[in-house]
Regions:
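Short, Lys/Arg-enriched, disordered terminal segments
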Residues: 1, 57, 88-90
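Short cysteine-rich loop/turn motifs with clustered Cys
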Residues: 1-17, 42
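Residue-level marker of positions within ordered structural domains that often coincide
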Residues: 9, 45, 75
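Amphipathic alpha-helical interface surfaces
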Residues: 14-17, 35-36, 66
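Histidine-centered catalytic micro-motifs
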Residues: 16-24, 41-47
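Short linker/helix segments within small regulatory modules
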Residues: 22-36
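Short Cys/His-centered divalent metal-binding micro-motifs
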Residues: 36-62
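Short flanking/linker segments adjacent to small metal-binding domains or redox-active Cys/His motifs
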Residues: 63-90
């Protein structure tokens, strides 16, 4: 069952969006590697005070989560991650 990564909601009140942790040039790579989370559209993804697109701390936590997940699943070092995504978030 899908739930919001930030607040835990199941999306019954505010529909869930798929948020690619590493966007822009890395969006397709995020999709392929499963580096995405579900977020409530209004409150946690786009418009809320702590939403991924409005709050630097939330975005940093997402990037750190994505880096740890990809490093664990691919048995990468920090240097391997930087080669793939261009930056260290941890």
């Amino acid at each position: 069952m899908k739930q919001c990564w930030l607040c835990g909601s199941n999306g019954s009140y505010d529909p869930l969006d798929k948020h690619h942790i590493f966007g822009g040039a890395n969006r397709k790579k995020s999709e392929r590697m499963g580096l995405y989370v579900y977020l409530c559209h209004n409150r946690c993804h786009i418009f809320g005070k702590y939403s991924a697109h409005q709050n630097k701390d939330t975005m940093l936590k997402l990037h750190q989560y994505g880096q740890r997940k990809s490093m664990e699943e691919n048995e990468w070092t920090t240097e391997d991650f930087i080669r793939e995504f261009g930056k260290n978030y941890i």
